[in-house]
Regions:
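Catalytic Walker B motif of ABC-type/P-loop ATPase nucleotide-binding domains
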Residues: 191-194
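Conserved ABC ATPase signature
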Residues: 166-170, 174
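ABC ATPase nucleotide-binding domains
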Residues: 1-25, 263-298
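Helix-to-loop junction immediately C-terminal to a conserved catalytic motif
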Residues: 75
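Conserved ABC ATPase "signature" region
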Residues: 141-162
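Conserved ABC transporter NBD signature motif
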Residues: 83-91, 101
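The feature captures the beta-strand-to-loop junction immediately N-terminal to the Walker
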Residues: 60-62
């Protein structure tokens, strides 16, 4: 059922067109500077960042370093006073809000309850696409029947058993999945998330991670801000460290966490003397099994 949404995204991956250098990236920030007041210190300082199409990219770093401000620049809530931002090669300044938020950019808020409007999960989902009637609208310009679109998103985000519940009665993880479902109904090519695992348990983190990886595999580009290093190491393709308004290092996630003394995982801290490249529990188990197999073969 989730194919209704994912097949459209998968088609983007299969296009074999020649693209300009700008168009190779879903997100490209060039030399961006931003401050909240004219004479106040810069929060974003000469920031350059490139994220490929279909990539799941995580940003980690301390509070107040400029991570959330960067998301606000990407979502056009604020604008840099110097530098440029491009989405799939197009200057962000040229986007109209309607174009940007209907089919291009999706923003998952830190507080999912801020976007709940109706008394049941199902009605809340339909509210995103202009209600149940199958008629063309600005909220729902595609030809697929709304029921099929809802069905696909519900399957993808695993909401089947929750459709008659009030959104406020859901657990933290369930609310996060509902918020994600609402954002995905707008068919974004790029998904921005601020601390999506905050306040949810490991079971729901795993479910969320699997959903995000599936979206990434089908061409959706994901930029996530997080303090959850375990989640980043497990699911993100690349991780960058934000410090004093800029990304100071950016590497493939396993390499990032394996070579980091401060931003690393519990598994890496415990096992790095024996398995320095292991950053998740699964990595450690795999390394132990491999060592045992090699010992037996000898």
């Amino acid at each position: 059922k989730e194919k209704h949404y994912l097949s459209e995204k998968n088609a983007l991956k299969k296009k074999k067109e020649k693209k300009s250098e700008k168009e190779e990236y879903a997100i490209e920030i060039k030399d961006a500077w931003f401050s909240y007041e004219k004479d106040s210190p810069d929060v974003v300082k000469d920031l350059t960042l490139q994220i490929r199409k279909g990539e799941f990219y995580a940003l980690v770093g301390g509070n107040g370093t400029g991570k959330s401000t960067t998301l606000s620049l990407l979502s056009k809530v604020r604008q840099p006073y110097r530098g440029r931002i491009y989405l799939e090669g197009k200057d962000l300044r040229t986007f109209k809000d309607k174009e940007l938020y209907n089919g291009y950019l999706g923003v998952l808020p830190q507080n999912p309850q801020s976007i709940f409007l109706k008394k049941t999960v199902l009605e809340d989902l339909y509210s995103v696409i202009g209600g149940r009637k199958n008629r063309p609208s600005e909220e729902y310009p595609i030809e697929m029947k709304k029921e099929k679109a809802i069905e696909g998103i519900v399957s993808l985000t695993r909401l089947e058993e929750l459709l008659d519940r009030h959104p406020y009665d859901l657990s933290g993880g369930e609310q996060q999945r509902l918020a994600l479902a609402k954002v995905l109904l707008l068919r974004p090519k790029i998904l921005l998330m601020d601390e999506p695992t905050k306040g949810i348990d490991n079971h729901y983190k795993k479910e969320l991670g699997e959903i995000l990886k599936k979206l990434s595999e089908h061409g959706v580009t994901i930029l996530m801000i997080s303090h959850d290093v375990e989640f980043c190491a497990q699911y993100a393709d690349r991780t960058g460290l934000f410090f004093q308004g800029n990304v100071v290092t950016s590497e493939e996630s396993k390499r990032f966490f394996a070579g980091n003394n401060f931003y690393t995982t519990a598994a890496n801290r415990m096992a790095r003397n024996y398995f320095p490249n292991a950053v998740t529990v699964e990595d450690v188990v795999k390394a132990i099994n491999q060592t045992e197999e090699e010992a037996v073969s000898c």
